[in-house]
Amino acid sequence: MATQISVDPRVEEEVGRGRSRVLVELRLPAGVRPEGEQRQAIARAQDEVLSRLSGTDFTLVRRFASTPFLALEVGPSALAALRTMGDVVVRVIADAVLPPARGSTPRR
């Protein structure tokens, strides 16, 4: 039985209107690894997801080298494809662009 992934309801709603910017959490093998091996595992999982999204309505926004995530903009066909990737995807969450917190940037 394929592992089901979790999809943020906000993503469902936005994709229903067209496209949504999302973070895709990748499923990596369990266990602690040296940093180099961890980065390789992340890159392999990212490559697998991007390969399987080929031909769907997605845009790569960002690959992360040290965290198991991809930032994407997806439409209905890409979200449908992600739902079938329980072997490499844990969840799909909304990626909201937020302004800096007040007081977190230096004054000029």
Report each predicted region and the residues it spans.
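Autoinhibitory N-terminal propeptides
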Residues: 1-108
